[in-house]
Amino acid sequence: VRPLFLLLMAIVLFAAGLLQAGEQDAIRTAGDVLLAVLPASAAGLTWYHHDFQGTLQFARAASLTLGVTFGLKYLVNEKRPDGGEHSFPSGHASLSFCAAEFMRKRYGGSVTIPAYAAAAFVGYSRVASKRHYTHDVLAGAALGIGSSYFFTRPWHGWCVQLDGGSRHGMLRLSRAW
């Protein structure tokens, strides 16, 4: 898992550098690259752990995410900020957050923060490049997180989760048997 953590951190730091440069095309391209990297990382983790059940869980979550996302795009047909069609919800955000939540819930640990940071950058890139409104990205993120949360079960190893629901926050350790 450590090589994946380092790869995700390198990509997030690269994306942060683009933010400082402020180049809209570079930010959009970095978001597109992360859109491919996040699901590939989620699938790669299942392969690394020889976790066939995890592969099925991620496939189900991603399928539901994409099906609902594209169904809503054609049902709502909201105009994009750049004048295009099918803005709501953001497919980039939905799939990115689906992958990030899958990695968090299935494996926890060191991949959680960089995966969510990368997914957040994907969402930011969609708004910065005028492809989506903020509410498109938030709806896509909620859809992706919800799908993965519903379909994913913690792996048989230890799972570390941060819970901000209480006033003080909580760190939860769990292990599936």
Regions found by a protein language model. Name each.
Residues 38-45:
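Hydrophobic core of alpha-helical transmembrane segments in multi-pass integral membrane proteins
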Residues 45-64:
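Interfacial segments of alpha-helical transmembrane regions
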